[in-house]
Regions:
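Cytochrome P450
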Residues: 1-411
């Protein structure tokens, strides 16, 4: 996406904008500088008013408080309160749902992501990773060089294909899925009408897929949502569509960003890379540290009740960003918080969120991330950024942080 239409940020403390391209690129430095200079909550008048707590304590306080903060909108954009479906259901349950409805909507989806359901996917994920590496390396050989894009040729395909198969969507539509993800999570500073048109395209695609499942039922998540009951009644069409959209978008962008960030770290920290190649049994522990240090997800809340939040006068319908990755780098919560220690054992990170909306797909995300790193290192044990300065690495914009373009050179 081009530079945001609000213009460049003048001061991160009073004019913070997560859609500024500099934000995700330099986020850890921005968070640290703000907190060290006495700003634990940043503010901005953009998007109609937005607050961003930066400490673990303050992020957790908002995440656990469902009375003063609503989840009916979780992606900050130019849209106003009137543009979102009312609580407690919201447009993409359960992530946009408030209590008490949230509990029931979430409970419907939990069985599909239980460990015993997710574990059998490992072989399929491993085969998919190997196929993507085969394709990327073959393309490099045809060009006669030793560079591949670890993001666009590898990381971005894995979760898109996996969640498509789980939902019952055509895996060959993964380019479409990537477009939907961009429109939902990165194109946030565009006009409301244009953003609405983007969601209309997603809805139209999902309506076609839902109609096909109604005519041809099968054993997948879409058919499950069409047949399950809530309070003795089938789910409403908007509930079905919203939950599918949630699983597609949340299941793709967060995990591909985590995979990409992990590979970026290994490309820029050769000692860590060599250590994991020599001792692959450390990879599961390293994965947890990558999730802590490079947590991809920042959620949002909408202020439901006017109140003073630690000296911040929050008004009804103000936005509140919840940067879980900033919480993960708070030295009050983690020893040596700004260091990436791939053998860190005590690691109660918030990469999957805090409170009632903690990610229900964490078992799947961990499996995809672990297998993706294992297969990459088994096939490409030595690599570095194609440009040592990292100038050709492109980071996302918006609430999901990760490399969108990650050229690496195979050594």
């Amino acid at each position: 996406m081009s530079a945001n239409t609000f213009g460049p940020v003048s001061d991160w403390a009073t004019d913070l904008d997560h859609a500024d391209p500099a934000y995700n690129r330099d986020a850890p430095t921005i968070w640290r500088d703000l907190v060290e200079h006495g700003c634990p909550v940043a503010h901005s008048t953009r998007y109609g008013g937005m607050w961003t707590p930066l400490t673990h304590e303050y992020v957790a306080e908002v995440a656990y408080d469902t009375e003063r903060f609503s989840s009916r909108a979780v992606v900050v954009s130019r849209s106003t309160a009137e543009d979102f479906m009312d609580a407690p259901v919201g447009g993409a349950p359960p992530i946009t749902s408030d209590p008490p409805f949230h509990h029931h909507a979430r409970r419907l989806l939990l069985p599909a992501f239980a460990p015993k359901v997710i574990e059998p996917w490992e072989d399929e994920i491993r085969a998919l990773c190997r196929a993507r590496l085969d394709a990327a390396l073959a393309a490099a050989n045809e060009r006669g060089d030793r560079t591949i894009d670890a993001a666009t040729q590898y990381a971005q395909h894995i979760p898109a294909n996996v969640i498509a198969r789980m939902l019952g969507l055509p895996p060959e539509d993964d380019e479409l899925f990537r477009g939907f993800v961009h429109d939902a999570l990165e194109a946030v500073d565009i006009e409301t009408s244009e953003r609405g048109a983007n969601f209309d395209r997603l809805d139209a695609y999902l309506d076609i897929q839902i109609a096909d499942h109604i005519e041809h039922p099968r054993d997948d998540l879409i058919s499950y949502l069409l047949n399950v009951e809530l309070f003795g009644e089938p789910l409403s069409p908007s509930h079905v569509r919203g939950s599918i959209a949630l699983l597609m978008i949340a299941g793709i962008d967060t995990t591909w960003s985590a995979i990409g960030s992990s590979l970026w770290h290994l490309a820029t920290h050769p000692d860590d890379c060599r250590r994991l190649v020599a001792r692959p049994e450390l990879i599961p522990v390293a994965i947890e540290e990558f999730l802590r240090a490079y947590a991809p997800v920042t959620m949002a809340r909408v202020v439901a009740k006017q109140h003073d939040f630690h000296g911040c006068p929050m008004e009804v319908d103000d936005w509140v960003l919840l940067p879980f990755p900033a919480a993960n780098r708070d030295p009050a919560a983690f020893d040596r918080a700004d260091e990436v220690l791939i053998d860190r054992l005590e690691n109660r990170h918030a990469a999957f969120g805090l409170g009632i909306h903690r990610c229900l797909g964490s078992n799947l995300a961990r499996l995809e991330l672990r297998v993706a790193v294992e297969e990459f290192l088994a096939r490409i044990p030595e690599f570095e950024l194609a440009n040592p300065a990292g100038d050709d690495v492109t980071w996302s914009v918006g609430q999901i942080r990760g490399p969108r373009v990650l050229p690496i050179r195979i050594l």
